[in-house]
Swiss-Prot record:
This is Protein VP3. It comes from Rotavirus A (strain RVA/Cow/France/RF/1975/G6P6[1]). Multifunctional enzyme involved in mRNA capping. Catalyzes the formation of the 5' cap structure on the viral plus-strand transcripts. Specifically binds to GTP and displays guanylyltransferase and methyltransferase activities. Has affinity for ssRNA but not for dsRNA. Capping activity is non-specific and caps RNAs that initiate with either a G or an A residue. Together with VP1 polymerase, forms a VP1-VP3 complex positioned near the channels situated at each of the five-fold vertices of the core. Contains a bipartite N7-methyltransferase domain, a 2'-O-methyltransferase domain and a GTase/RTPase domain. The C-terminus contains a phosphodiesterase domain that degrades the 5'-triphosphorylated, 2'-5' linked adenylate oligomers produced by the host cell in response to IFN stimulation. Keywords: GTP-binding, Host-virus interaction, Hydrolase, Inhibition of host innate immune response by virus, Methyltransferase, mRNA capping, mRNA processing, Multifunctional enzyme, Nucleotide-binding, Nucleotidyltransferase, RNA-binding, S-adenosyl-L-methionine, Transferase, Viral immunoevasion, Virion. InterPro entries: VP3_Rotav.
Length: 835
């Protein structure tokens, strides 16, 4: 959903678009709630309130002020992520249809021959960091840039077994045109940048679990963040390999040597960050022209000093000359060194060339050892070739993708590695490593152990659901880690599957009730965005690849109506009720019927069941940004911070009724997951609320009416407005509450319209218009620990006779209250009041 705020209506009609005019009779929160539950994708919001827009954005729903027609046309035709703090729109708009172009934000790609392999008539477009270079295309009242790129397809090609790039990219573009937009991938880059900048400024120690290559630029400016990954491939691990020969295989039609060099340097850099938590000087020997340095500098102020007879245009200090072992003394401490020396083969025969390569490998290794032999805070990455070698057993092996697999690989060493035990590694073993291993991640830090960290903020995005983690340990970490943002895969199967397959792995599945957290927000991706100053135009869809975002230790926990709130809670219900159901009131009717309340007259305005809880349960796959458990808990402890809106606090029994209705719904749908979720939420309600039932009552509240439009033979027909189980000493407390509610009780619009047999020989008249006040009264008694109401649903009625009678129907007739009283069952009236 996207909300585009206009000061006046537009003449043009757009598909999947609805107009909402601000309702001055309602406050900003109520307007925001009504907007959020509209069913179209585009909402044109007229006569808007800025406060309402703020409320929607905090809820993760993109809402933007529009000043020009161009702005409206641009935003209505594509999806986007909105930074509502800095007023920046990040479009996710592929431009195939306007410019026949493939988009990239990696500068090195533009310096390859990739255009030779694009579709006929197509070109490559460089858009800069998150589309920064496209800002000039949009002369808007807000900052706007198009962050959509095809880098995901380019990188997937590099790691795939496909060689024909044109066929590969054509297939990927067709996939993009026939499947839903990978909005999370596009939006996630914006989110990660914002997230870690915020966390580093707010927390002294941040830990990140499971980063992948898509985050390799995000952390360049955050050396203090401790990374945990899958660990490195060490020299000593080659002991498991059998010897092989040179294979030789082309991985890419266009030259990706620069990409390999970038990955090597970034892997080395993150090793340095892991050890020293600060930025080093980056020395590079060879590897010109290194256009990728431009990409790195978009994200960080890292300094590069380079040596190569060829130009390196983006280096801070370039020496256009060869580098020798004697030059190592020029290199300072607190640095990394990348050695990529290899002369061109030119016309040399194979044997001569092989001899040169082995000599250069020995020379490269000598430079590395010399660099690491003195000083402090140093890490080196050196180019190697498959040959008989003695190498430190703790050194890390790298084999990032390159244009052709031949005989080269890379070795990362720190000072300690260079002095560690060395082992002889035969050439054939190194060929086996090269032929069968592609390094897939620049993050090669040690794996994360599933244990609580006392002083750190833990971030684990899409990293802990894998079934090689112990599920109980994951739950324990979420429950006990005081400061964290952790995601786990949500269980949106229908058979309550404990794990689901994803790509070539299996993930555990989770529901919010799997966790026991009292100070954590459990929400969706879009709900999480709102807490970090972002909103999105396309909400999460129940694809099977959805995650719960669990934020622990956030200062937004008590702000119940501002973040992870009830916005859009009825949206899925509206979509179904107005397009597929037998009646638009089907939800209300089902909730009443499933709790044995058969008086459906006015059910849409007088309902016994919490619609919020019911919708949050049965449609949780469509909207789990609403943190239901937090909502229940904060109300149960009376700690909810409510900023505005027509906010109705439910009585705990209404929540129980909702769970029962959801359970009935789940059985009809054969939805085992909702069935379990409903049971567990009901158990949670009973846990946090101390609900007691007056199933053996000794007092009741009665309402006597001035007029009863039916024949009756009981002595005093009345409405039993709830029963109590109290001691005589509590009577004054009950009376005090009744007096407090006096005006509201006498203002009730009480009506009746038919009679019916409640059971055999109990003839009653229906009563409407009292449920809302009944549940408010229930809440007041609950807060004073007064037992009021029974476990079965309260069905308001007036007993007319204790014999079987014929059902009577009349027009809706108002019942005027004569007086209200408190009486002991089989005893005397102890209190009464009149208007």
């Amino acid at each position: 959903m996207k909300v585009l705020a206009l000061r006046h209506s537009v003449a043009q009609v757009y598909a999947d678009t609805q107009i909402y005019t601000h309702d001055e009779t309602k406050d900003d929160y109520e307007n925001a709630f009504l907007i959020s539950n509209l069913t179209t994708h585009n909402i044109l919001y007229l006569n808007y309130s800025v406060k309402t827009l703020q409320i929607l954005n905090k809820s993760g729903i993109a809402a933007i002020e529009i000043q020009k027609n161009d702005e409206l046309f641009t935003l209505i035709r594509c999806n986007f992520t909105y930074d509502y703090i800095d007023d920046i729109v990040y479009l996710h708009d592929y431009s195939y249809y306007t410019n026949n172009e493939i988009r990239t934000d990696q500068h090195w790609v533009t310096k390859t021959n990739i255009e030779d392999y694009l579709l006929p008539g197509w070109k490559l477009m460089y858009v800069g960091y998150n589309g920064n270079d496209t800002r000039g295309h949009y002369n808007f009242s807000f900052k706007c840039q198009n962050a959509a790129t095809d880098d995901d397809a380019i990188i997937e090609y590099i790691y795939s077994n496909e060689l024909d790039f044109q066929n590969f990219i054509l297939k990927k573009i067709k996939e993009r045109m026939t499947t839903s937009l990978p909005i999370a991938r596009l939006s996630n880059r914006v989110f990660r940048d914002k997230l870690f900048k915020t966390l580093v400024s707010d927390h002294s120690r941040v830990v990140n679990v499971g980063p992948r290559n898509e985050s390799m630029f995000t952390f360049l400016d955050h050396p203090s963040i401790k990374q945990f990954s899958n660990g490195p491939y060490l020299v000593k691990d080659t002991i498991k390999l059998k010897q092989e020969r040179w294979l030789g295989k082309r991985l890419s039609q266009f030259d990706i040597g620069q990409y390999k060099n970038m990955l090597n340097v970034l892997t080395t850099l993150y090793q340095y960050y892991d050890m020293y938590h600060e930025k080093p000087i980056i020395y590079m020997v060879g590897s010109a022209p290194s256009y990728w340095i431009h990409d790195v500098k978009q994200y960080s102020d890292l300094k590069f000093e380079t040596w190569d007879p060829l130009d390196t245009p983006y280096s801070d200090l370039h020496h256009k000359e060869l580098f020798y072992a004697s030059d190592v003394t020029k290199l300072k401490d607190n640095s990394i060194l990348y050695v990529d020396i290899r002369t061109d083969r030119e016309n040399a025969d194979w044997k001569t060339w092989r001899k040169i390569v082995e000599e250069q490998t020995a020379n490269n290794l000598n430079i590395a050892y010399k660099y690491l032999s003195t000083g402090k805070a140093k890490v080196c990455c050196v180019k190697m070739t498959a040959m008989d070698l003695e190498l430190p057993i703790s050194a890390k092996l790298l084999h990032h993708p390159t244009t052709e697999i031949r005989s080269e690989f890379y070795l990362i060493m720190d000072i300690w590695d260079s002095k560690n035990t060395k082992r002889f590694i035969p050439k054939g073993v190194l060929y086996s490593y090269i032929n069968n291993t592609i390094t897939e991640n620049v993050f090669i830090q040690q794996p994360f152990k599933l244990r609580t960290l006392r002083n750190e903020y833990v971030v684990a995005l899409y990293a802990l659901s894998n079934d090689f983690n112990n599920r109980e340990d994951v739950v324990k970490l979420v429950n006990n880690q005081k400061n964290a943002l952790i995601t786990v895969r949500i269980n949106n199967t229908f058979k309550d599957e404990p794990k689901v397959g994803f790509k070539d792995i299996y993930d555990w599945t989770f529901l919010p009730t799997d966790f026991e957290t009292n100070e954590s927000i459990i929400t969706s991706y879009d709900g999480c965005l709102g807490m970090f100053g972002l909103s999105i135009s396309l909400a999460s869809k129940p694809t099977g690849n959805n995650h719960l975002f669990i934020l622990s230790g956030t200062n937004k926990y008590f702000k119940l109506d501002q973040f992870a709130n009830h916005m859009s809670i009825s949206r899925r219900s509206h979509q179904i009720r107005f397009s597929e159901s037998a009646t638009s009131y089907s939800g209300y009717i089902f909730r009443d019927l499933s709790n044995n309340n058969f008086n459906l007259i006015g059910t849409n305005v007088e309902n016994s069941v919490s619609g919020h809880v019911y919708n949050a349960l049965i449609y949780y796959r469509y909207n789990y940004s609403f943190d239901l458990k937090r909502w229940i808990y904060l109300h149960s402890t009376n700690k909810a911070s409510i900023e505005g809106g027509r906010y109705y606090e439910h009585a705990p029994i209404e929540l129980i009724y909702a769970c029962r209705s959801a359970r009935e719904f789940a059985k009809l749908q054969d939805d085992l997951t909702v069935l379990r979720y409903s049971n567990e939420i009901e158990n949670y309600i009973n846990k946090v609320y101390s609900i007691t039932y007056a199933d053996d009552p000794n007092y009741f509240i009665g309402i006597k009416f001035k007029n009863i439009p039916y024949e009756y033979d009981v002595k005093v027909p009345h409405l039993t407005f709830g029963v109590l189980n109290i001691s005589d000493s509590m009577v004054p407390d009950v009376v005090a509450i009744l007096k407090k509610f006096k005006n509201e009780l006498f203002r009730m619009d009480v009506t009746t319209s038919y009679t019916y047999m409640l059971s055999d020989e109990i003839y009653v008249a229906n009563v409407s218009g009292v449920l809302s006040t009944y549940f408010k009264l229930y809440n007041a008694f609950y807060k004073e620990q007064i037992t009021f109401g029974q476990s079965r649903m309260f069905i308001p009625h007036i007993t007319l006779s204790f014999s079987n009678k014929r059902v009577v129907r009349i027009g809706s007739t108002r019942l005027n209250i004569d007086f209200i009283y408190l009486r002991k069952i089989k005893g005397d009236t102890v209190f009464d009041m009149t208007e």
